[in-house]
Amino acid sequence: MSRLSLLGLTAAVVLLSSFCQDRIHVDAAAACKGCAPPCVCPGTKGERGNPGFGGEPGHPGAPGQDGPEGAPGAPGMFGAEGDFGDMGSKGARGDRGLPGSPGHPGLQGLDGLPGLKGEEGIPGCNGTDGFPGMPGLAGPPGQSGQNGNPGRPGLSGPPGEGGVNSQGRKGVKGESGRSGVPGLPGNSGYPGLKGAKGDPGPYGLPGFPGVSGLKGRMGVRTSGVKGEKGLPGPPGPPGQPGSYPWASKPIEMEVLQGPVGPAGVKGEKGRDGPVGPPGMLGLDGPPGYPGLKGQKGDLGDAGQRGKRGKDGVPGNYGEKGSQGEQGLGGTPGYPGTKGGAGEPGYPGRPGFEGDCGPEGPLGEGTGEAGPHGAQGFDGVQGGKGLPGHDGLPGPVGPRGPVGAPGAPGQPGIDGMPGYTEKGDRGEDGYPGFAGEPGLPGEPGDCGYPGEDGLPGYDIQGPPGLDGQSGRDGFPGIPGDIGDPGYSGEKGFPGTGVNKVGPPGMTGLPGEPGMPGRIGVDGYPGPPGNNGERGEDCGYCPDGVPGNAGDPGFPGMNGYPGPPGPNGDHGDCGMPGAPGKPGSAGSDGLSGSPGLPGIPGYPGMKGEAGEIVGPMENPAGIPGLKGDHGLPGLPGRPGSDGLPGYPGGPGQNGFPGLQGEPGLAGIDGKRGRQGSLGIPGLQGPPGDSFPGQPGTPGYKGERGADGLPGLPGAQGPRGIPAPLRIVNQVAGQPGVDGMPGLPGDRGADGLPGLPGPVGPDGYPGTPGERGMDGLPGFPGLHGEPGMRGQQGEVGFNGIDGDCGEPGLDGYPGAPGAPGAPGETGFGFPGQVGYPGPNGDAGAAGLPGPDGYPGRDGLPGTPGYPGEAGMNGQDGAPGQPGSRGESGLVGIDGKKGRDGTPGTRGQDGGPGYSGEAGAPGQNGMDGYPGAPGDQGYPGSPGQDGYPGPSGIPGEDGLVGFPGLRGEHGDNGLPGLEGECGEEGSRGLDGVPGYPGEHGTDGLPGLPGADGQPGFVGEAGEPGTPGYRGQPGEPGNLAYPGQPGDVGYPGPDGPPGLPGQDGLPGLNGERGDNGDSYPGNPGLSGQPGDAGYDGLDGVPGPPGYPGITGMPGLKGESGLPGLPGRQGNDGIPGQPGLEGECGEDGFPGSPGQPGYPGQQGREGEKGYPGIPGENGLPGLRGQDGQPGLKGENGLDGQPGYPGSAGQLGTPGDVGYPGAPGENGDNGNQGRDGQPGLRGESGQPGQPGLPGRDGQPGPVGPPGDDGYPGAPGQDIYGPPGQAGQDGYPGLDGLPGAPGLNGEPGSPGQYGMPGLPGGPGESGLPGYPGERGLPGLDGKRGHDGLPGAPGVPGVEGVPGLEGDCGEDGYPGAPGAPGSNGYPGERGLPGVPGQQGRSGDNGYPGAPGQPGIKGPRGDDGFPGRDGLDGLPGRPGREGLPGPMAMAVRNPPGQPGENGYPGEKGYPGLPGDNGLSGPPGKAGYPGAPGTDGYPGPPGLSGMPGHGGDQGFQGAAGRTGNPGLPGTPGYPGSPGGWAPSRGFTFAKHSQTTAVPQCPPGASQLWEGYSLLYVQGNGRASGQDLGQPGSCLSKFNTMPFMFCNMNSVCHVSSRNDYSFWLSTDEPMTPMMNPVTGTAIRPYISRCAVCEVPTQIIAVHSQDTSVPQCPQGWSGMWTGYSFVMHTAAGAEGTGQSLQSPGSCLEEFRAVPFIECHGRGTCNYYATNHGFWLSIVDQDKQFRKPMSQTLKAGGLKDRVSRCQVCLKNR
């Protein structure tokens, strides 16, 4: 060991000497000037010594502070696939969510188009003035208003009388008076007579925005700002299956179409595997079977015009053609000459209803009560009503059972065992405020189960005798108007009479219109006359200074000032608030068991106990407080205590050896901002080099859509398109247009979600140098850095103290040998103060090196020397070891936003943090702005109660006292302990009800009692006043963010912040380790509390004996309605009813009065918690209450917002004939017909009788085109004589509309048939151009009430009230029922016009008004279908035919717009002949002229458009009967497909004669994104060949599709399989028994469903045969009140089996179940004699449901 030490010492000497050799003299002198002689050690460098042995390890250091949270580790490897977990138990019902935040106000709608000018209305008659309204109640004195505008000067009044103290003289003209308070709104006047016809007004301003349109398509899903917590929804469907170990979030799969694999055996649904790699392209398959014959192709393009064919034999006269379509409108003709006076016109249409006249006189008379209306549908749930006034206290209920023992308190600190003498009883202190609730105590030992109680007796008395009949009540108020009934069947057309009826009664006043736009300010009125002279004023002293004004609104924030100079270093601040508790340390070592306690003294003998048992003794007087007992005997040794707290940090150990440089650590999270450090010295300005610009980051995710911009102005009307209509086939979508001009900048949108974190950009330009921060903790020693550049020689620093010799350094490079110096010696003297700088002496000769002297004592540091000259560059040294970390700089200014980074991976769920320490109470806030004038306040609270007197002895039960006045509120009593159950006292006589007392002070929170019995319903409380609506706040736009200022000093503690929005639910953390604690020692019983205040009076006595009923008096005259009486005496309690169903949770009740202090009971053992009882039976319905008297008339309400569009009204009477419509467009060219063979001209036969119309023949196939004819120009032939017109054939019956069939195969060309008889009218032509917009129709009925509006913007904050006593924490109440409507409040002063609020809830639908006048005729609608042929007309007159040469058809001009008709002008002078005008409109047919000469045939013109139908020709001679045609065969079957559903798990069989196409599962409808899309159960689309709970996916605009990752639904026809016993959802293969099977069948003819609306199966129509019978299924709804329906003509509306809900609901997570929101709708039976009567409501129970369901049959048309 000594050798080793010597070796180490030698190495140290060698190293030290070598170290000293490398130092230059100048450095040595500079480093330790004044410490010791310079170290001069000549000699050669020794060899490197062996490394020394490591020293002993130092003491372990104190535990450091908690380090910053480490960065998340790299994601681990995927774990092995876990097994399916067991199905979890049903979760507890979630808490009621917070109400959602109000949505953003919608944008203002576009202005409507200006309406057309209305026709002049009939002038109304003047109405009579209404009666003056009743004088209103006197309002409270209002606040002084602002000075009004100067009024008009009044007329000069007579001179006033002289004042008291003056002879009086004319005063100066007084200032204008202030504007008076606006009067109350008067009652609406009666409607006035219609005024005279007014001049046509100018075009009106654009109308108000129209009614909101239907909901548009769903917009892009953007993440909006998180709303407030919503109300709890209905119980949700079961949760999703557990996540796999590696599934940190749902994987959004992009759907790629993979190759179809071979069909395997259908197994259970597997788990979703990861997407596999794309497969290889498969080989070409074998050629398929030849496909079915394709559908008939579209018509080809028209071929070239063929040559003219030979003239055929004249055919038979055709049938009279139908009227052709109207031609295009001609160009306007020249104005005609003024016509003569016309004949009197028909009576004009009634004009629009005139404005309402003034109110007529009140009519008298009492109508009889109308019939009771049908029960209306449930209204939309209203918003939460204002809280009503507290009701009168109900009768005291029976005493509840003893409550459960309260939670044990927190154990106190163990005190030293003391011994005190009992002192005198102190005076009662004031009751203290309620303290903060203590932390929950440790659980006590389990008690023993108590003994069973005595069984109770259920006694039910006999029912009472029937009372005598009451007097007849007053006639009831007419009931509400019932909902509009269903539309009846269309009645028979009435017979109109061409008369104008007498004018109708003046209609009721209409609903107030929408508020008009704010008008333009009017011109100032003329100055008024001088006012009357004011009275002289006597001695007018100065006014008393007014009260201090309300504090003003806080001003706007000023602009940030320039940064101020650096402040001085502040004083040390007050110690900060205690920090949040640190994270839990690791478990400490188990503490040693405690020492046994000191043995207690034996206790005194207790007093005799109370007799326990069913004795009827009254409770005794409580005894005096006993003395403290002596300490008890020592208890048993306690069990091991809880683990001790971790020990404090130990003292710092000695520093250990420097370790190896560690690996580079993971970047820690950004630390908290450090406090401001001491400002450092001003550093030199750093160099700045501009960095290279960074590469642009990745594009962030799409932000939230901004609010839509304001609508742009309406563009000018476009040029009308040319009216050349080629085949009306929709063209291909056009090319996208050029981007529009940029709109104005919209308001800032809501902030988008943060984009993914982008990659690090290139370094930016260095910012300005920040201030130095506080010194940071020393960092770890880093690895040696790269060799730095050679720095300039700095100034000499202040001489420091000589340090201890450092560790041995590495040997340096050998320095240049110095000149030998003189040998010096001497004893080191004490260090003197440094002297002044002497003059520079001449340089001495260098002396030889001296021996090294011993180190001198460290001297005191000298003053800093002056700056020396720059030395020469030294030789580069070895790279030094890495220095310690520098001080942390002060945070620089906020840098510019970096490019958004890519989104990081979701972190794992964090550990649950411990509850934080409760925050300190915030300071009182500044007083808010003064509120508006409120309604008169309710009476203030009474003062504090006086001290309670000494309780007197119980007196005898007195007679009922007179009605007491308001009692004072008592102070809250201390919480007494539970006393024993007292005996039931005698019932007192019920007292008169007292007036409504004011609310008492809140009491201390009582212990939770056992739930009491359901008390009888109390009488309704008086309705509360309605609060004034607050003014909405202005919508402010966010300002630009200011520059980050310097950090300011810590401000005073801020006001307590409002509760933040609830955070998102965190993911469930892992189960923590739990160690059961050992039970603590039993504490000593506490002292008895102070006596409580007097309790409330005892329960009411038994009800008195009912008196004998009086004789029935005669009915008196009905009196005037009295004012609302006081609340009556509570009635006698009825017989105890059976338990009712659970009601909704009531609102939290007022705290009860404190009870009398009971005697201290013995501490019982805690009982075992009982099991949940069974729900009670439903109680009997109570008797309906008496109808209340009518309330006072309320003030007129604010105009309601426009309701939604109502349902379409009843079919109106047929309108007057409309004006002739514009001419329609020309029809398209027809296809050329087949060429017939030449027939022989027949002899004219006798006219035959009209034959019956024959059956419609099948359409012939297209023939081949004929050979082109040659053009032959022959001489014109002689004009033949005109033949007689033929008779018209009878019209054929209209054919039924057939369903479109599949295209048939091409047939062979048929034989040319003989001329067939007239066919039925053809199919309607293609749809024409859309007609002009019709005129505005009548307003529809008011719509159903809309969805409740969003909550309004909160009003301004009122003045702060005085601090109240701390209330007891109430239980969270559920939403109460809306209170009854309160009495009308006193009319308030007219407030300022508020900003437009959010749209309120739609009002109730108004009473249906009388039928309005006929509106203007609408614009021409679309051309209707051709009507049935009219009756045969008489043969027309014989016309002379004239053949004019056909002219060239002109091009169609653009139809001009219809101008207003001008007034006829006077005849002007004849002008010179003008140019040839445009061809005029065709005039009326002139008399036939003489036959002209036959002209040369003209060239064949192009085929013209189809001309208008010609006039009816003369009847021709009857032709010869043609040969009978051969009977046609059956047309080929087009095939009709339908689906048939079995409603079982068996695949249904197609009916006889039908062939099955495929089989599958019965899909009813799907619901995605909250919208339902249904299937017709009679169509093949409702039979999917494969089943899945989520058979569809949704795709977005980013070409990404998602499968089973949303809350969507699918609904399937179900079987009769019942629900599971636990009613939990089914999953996997357990779903199969619930899903109905189906088959798709094909039949050759049409198939329909007929419904009887009766319990009997209907018969198929003649020519149809039945296929199956069933029940008429109409509609279905489910989640979100969404659903679809069945067409009643479809076979899907006739289900073979009836079930109330014939379908099951399935979700995307693979579960199916029946839910309470699923409803089925079935046609009900309608009796023949009750078709137009009010339907009787009826509720059917199970077993009799089919008695009211309509039956149906599916029928097939016979061939």
Swiss-Prot record:
Disruption phenotype: At 20 degrees Celsius, there is reduced axon regeneration following injury in D-type motor neurons in temperature-sensitive mutant embryos. Its main location: secreted. The keyword Disulfide bond applies. Changing G403E: In allele g34; temperature-sensitive lethality during late embryogenesis. Residues 21-194 form a propeptide. Trimers of two alpha 1(IV) and one alpha 2(IV) chain. Type IV collagen forms a mesh-like network linked through intermolecular interactions between 7S domains and between NC1 domains. Collagen type IV is specific for basement membranes. Required to restrict presynaptic growth at the neuromuscular junctions (NMJ) in late larval stage and in adult motor neurons. May play a role in axon regeneration in embryos following injury in D-type motor neurons. This is Collagen alpha-1(IV) chain. It comes from Caenorhabditis elegans.
